[in-house]
Each structure stands twice: as C-alpha cells, then as structure tokens.
Design a protein with these regions (language model features):
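Metallocofactor- and cofactor-centric catalytic cores in central/energy metabolism, strongly enriched
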Residues: 1-409, 416-496
C-alpha cells in the first residue's frame, strides 16, 4: 500500500494514507519526501518549501495560504494554513463543459412505484405529517396504533414530527409550508395523513394554498380540534390509506426516473479521494442515463463555486447560481458570522483544514455533470440532470431538503460515521475501510477499497448496480434497518 498520494499533479501537498512517523520517507513523482513531523492518516504533507502568503494547492486548486514558512516534508494543518475566502464576490461566466453521452448505461432500470402524477418512488410508505408541532405526540400515537395495517406492499408507516407551523411569519413560514408540501407530494409515500390542530398559523386551509393540486385518494386531512376522538379518526384514515397502498405494485422503470440526493457529513481527508469521487462517477452515469441528481449544502460550495458556475448550462443558470452563493453568504453575514467558519472538529481531526479544502472535496459528488437548474428550498426538481439546491451544510436539514425536493434516496458520504436517516433511504458511503468495518451497522458501502488499489471503474460499476438494487427494494439502507426516520426544517426568522 502507498504511504501517501498526490491527488493532482499541480498539488503542493500529499495526503498520508496511513499514520507516518517523523524521519520516515516516501516517493512522490520521483522525489523522496522525508517527514519533518509525525502525520496522521488523512492529513497533509508539504511537497515543497512554501513561503508565507503562498497559495497551497490540493485537488489542483488553492485551499488557502500559508501563515508561515513551511518546509518540504512538514505537516500542514490549522497551525500553518489559513482560509483565503472573501465575502460577496463578482463572478464571471466561463463555460467549461461538454455534453458527453459516452457514459450512458443502456437499459439501466429498477423496479419502482409509479404515482398518479407520473413520478416514481422507490418505497411505498404511509406518512403522517403534522402541520404544526402541537400535534406531534398525536401523530406519533397514530403511527404506533396503525402498525397493525403494515403488510404486503406497504414498507412502513411513519410520522414526521417537527416544532414549527405556528408562531412563524413571512418567508420563514413559507419555507416551512413549501418543505411540508414537498414531503406530502413525495413519490415514496403511497398515502399521507396531514394532521393539523386548527388554530395554528399553518392551519390546513392556509396550507392548502401552498400545497396546490393533490391526489384526494392518497392525501387525507384531519384537524384535531374538529373531532371528538382524534386518535380513532386518525387511525381510521391511515387504515383507508393502507388499503389503497396495498394495491400498489412495483413496475420496471428506466433509471431516468430516479432523483437522487447527494450529501456528505463527518468528512475526513479521504472523503475527497474515495467516497466523493465514487459518488461523482455515479452522478455522471445517472445523468448520462437521463436521471437526476441534487447537490445542496451551499456553504460547502464556497471556495469551489466557480467550478460549478463554469458548468452551468447557460448564462441564466449561471446567474441563478451566483445568487444562490451570494444569498447564502449574506445569510451568514446577516448574523455576524464568518463564512469560512465551517470545518467541524471532526473534519479537522480527519485532516480537513479550510472550507476551500472541504468544498473542493464536497463538489466532487456532482461529478462533471452540467448544472441544469437551481432550486430554492422546498422547490420540486423538474429538470433532468444536475440541480443545485438551496440548503445548509447541516446533515439532517440538508438531507431533508433533498427529500422535500423529490430525492427518493440520499447518498451520504462520511469519513467519521453517522447513524441518522431522513424520510427517504439514506445510504452511508464510508471514505475509509476501518470506518466501514467498525460501524458496519451504519455503513452501506465501503469506498475505502479504493485506497487498497481496487479498480475505480470496477467499483463504480458495482456501486451503480448497488444503488439500483436499493431503489428496487432488494436491499434496505442501514438507516431503514435501524428505523432512523428523522426530520429537520431550515428556519430563518423570528419566533413569536
């Protein structure tokens, strides 16, 4: 096994593939590098002498500037590397993409559930969605009392509780409404019970204005203040929905019907070498096959945004991307926060130093696909290909945002590990094999095999097939097996 890797020929750093001791050496591009310090796996090593203020390159792009003189063979991290990110920027459109059908996977297909609106889901579940947090406990009780009706083609009955829906104003409330509307229309739901209280800001009559047209057979409403026994009536409505969903059958569908969300969390120094490029290959293959992928966590585009902007289909999409980036920077600044204050303690422990470094690894999940659309929070994905979605870096908030925009599953890469799940199957892809082995009950796929010189193309083919099997219901995500069905909504406003 190699001791270190230079990701791009222009990089001024290498990444340690195993723990290395001071005084040990390794070869990179014909030169012998002698370590000046102990360096843990996933962390960076200087490949040349670097002067104060000089840009440090990884992935072929700057990840920050040197704080001090750094000698060849030295450990590089927060003590000698700083972010170079600015605030609001003026961007220029420099198109750098090409339509490439060479990746097309002919006849790629899966078995899914086609809904009345034409969309295709990969699960057939009954969802109970409160309009307001006041009825969360009632929703949970209805879920528990309805489990007797889970059978046959029904994959599960779940309530999705949240604390919002009242004491919200303006755009903050509209964000909640759009998010909940996205879930209610989701193709993974064979039926939905919308549970209201009656006096909330987001009461059912007001919410229906945002919800728009809906399938009256599959979406039912119940106001708890309007009935004597809300539990009995709620369970009866769920029973009716289950009777309908039992008749649903999987059918053969083209991979072009898939909408897949992309997310990373607990990233480490290997995420941008293994797991994220593997997901990028998946994204290229699915979009070439006519499918759709959604990329969010906008703060983790900072420092790599120009790469995405250069892949925008046209000037209109470019302008939307600029607005997406600068609006999120303004959101940080409005609260007096630095835009580069992102890498978490876990990220840093795993070898990531700056937000630029994190972002350059993060955007690899989108492969080389053309950016076809930019979506506001809660807006459904309707354009095939790669779309950028407004959302934060927070794992649960971002994953739920992907689901609300129509993602039927989320591919979640991680170097540290996390057990959570959102309303759709949340597949965890480990960046390193030790994590996959230690947390086999969390991790669905081991991308760390690439560090052991596994063929990238072979693993990419295997992973594409793996995702299609998950979509067909032949494999359940570990998050599903652990019964992790969590919900979190992005909030930006006052609470009355």
């Amino acid at each position: 096994m190699k001791q270190a890797i230079q990701i791009h020929p222009n990089d001024t750093v290498a990444v340690a593939l195993t723990d290395l001791n001071r005084g040990s050496s390794f070869m990179i591009d014909g030169q012998n590098i002698i370590l000046c310090d102990d360096v843990k796996a996933g962390h960076k090593i200087a490949l040349k002498d670097i002067n104060p203020g000089e840009r440090i390159l990884k992935y072929g792009y700057p990840i920050g500037t040197a704080k001090v003189h750094i000698s060849k063979g030295s450990f590089i991290h927060s003590h000698n590397l700083r972010s170079s990110l600015g605030e609001l920027l003026d961007y220029r459109y420099h198109p750098d993409f090409q339509d490439d059908c060479s990746l097309k996977a002919p006849n790629a297909s899966f078995y899914g559930y086609r809904r009345s609106d034409g969309r295709v889901g990969i699960r057939n579940e009954i969802w109970i969605i409160p309009t307001v947090g006041c009825v969360n406990a009632i929703a949970k009780e209805i879920e528990q009392q309805s489990q007797q009706y889970k059978k046959g083609e029904i994959d599960g009955i779940y309530s999705y509780n949240h604390p919002y829906g009242c004491s919200q104003l303006g755009e903050d409330q509209r964000m909640t409404q759009k998010f909940l509307s996205g879930l209610i229309h989701h193709p993974n739901a064979g039926g939905v019970l919308v549970l209201g209280l009656g006096c909330e800001n987001n009461n059912i009559p007001e919410f229906k204005k945002v919800l728009g047209a809906y399938d009256e057979n599959r979406i039912r409403f119940l106001n708890c203040q309007d009935c004597k026994d809300e539990l009995a009536e709620g369970v009866a409505l769920v029973k009716e929905l289950c009777e309908l969903a039992l008749k649903d059958k999987r059918e053969l569908c083209s991979a072009r019907e898939l909408i897949v969300g992309l997310k990373c969390g607990g990233s480490d120094g290997f995420s941008g070498i293994t797991a994220n490029p593997l997901i990028g290959a998946f994204s290229d293959r699915l979009t070439a096959d006519g499918g759709s992928v959604l990329l969010t966590e906008v703060p983790e585009m900072f420092g790599a945004e120009q790469l995405l902007m250069n892949r925008c289909r046209n000037k209109t999409i470019f302008n939307k991307t600029v607005k997406l980036i600068n609006d999120f920077k303004s959101y940080f600044m409005r609260y007096g926060e630095r835009i580069d204050e992102n890498p978490s303690p876990g990220n840093k422990a795993g070898g990531i130093t700056t937000l630029e470094e994190k972002s350059l690894g993060c955007v690899q999940k989108a492969g080389t696909a053309i950016v076809e659309d930019v979506l506001s929070y809660g807006k459904p994905a309707t354009v095939k290909g790669l779309s950028l979605l407004q959302g934060p870096g927070n794992d649960l908030v971002a994953s739920c945002a992907l689901a609300a925009s129509g993602a039927v599953m989320v591919l979640f890469t991680t170097g540290r590990g996390t057990p959570f799940g959102c309303p759709v199957p949340t597949l965890k892809i480990a960046s390193n094999t030790p994590l996959a082995q230690k947390k086999s009950h969390w991790i669905d796929y081991d991308a760390g095999q690439l560090l052991n010189e596994q063929s990238f193309d072979i693993l990419a083919d295997d992973f594409y097939d793996f995702v299609l099997r998950v979509a067909s219901g032949k494999i359940n995500a570990k998050s599903e097996r652990l019964d992790k069905h969590d919900l979190s909504i992005f909030k930006d406003g006052v609470t009355l």
